[in-house]
């Protein structure tokens, strides 16, 4: 069966990236993805996919970090990390599995990594086409810096050199454009955008519910920016999964969330392929 050609975007999700990574695997199994885009934790998965890292290795990367507690390592300037990985861990994993010194221009497919230009208060889309000389490690460090404060441009020289010298600080890509779902709008091929499903509207936040409040912030930003919308030739896939902002997870939980994300995305496969068995999961 001929797989259709599409482009795929992966939203940020913090430690819930387990679900979205599973969803990305389901899409990749059913279509020929011509380009990957991502912001925040989604940028890490998108970059790995664009460089041909296998789904098994991506799953192992996420599982090893969350199961080991490395997500709570201290980051830049001893600021405790609250995101998926500490910045050093992200860089080391990308160097190991993609290659030390790899640049955006080396990706096998089109690639877009969303970061936030804090000096100008706007999103900045780093791409293989426009920023081939930017180091993959540094692009992902800037994009996945959620709750680590900011990333000084001086610490990611390939960004500072390739872009404007008046950019001093970068922030997490999810702060300004968490879904990066419109970067492929100019392409004639369909676009599939993966994001966590909205939470139950009946669940009320309570004072002191830190995980719930953290999960509500990006949803509010998405609403304000009007980024969740219907596209002329695309599909917004809401991945079923709960983000409780748990930064330490057992391998069994990571596997379960991966499988749930895979099956959630696979249910949409008839839209672009007509798969007879859309509930097949990567995890047995």
Where does each model-flagged region fall?
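Patatin-like phospholipase
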Residues: 1-37, 47-284
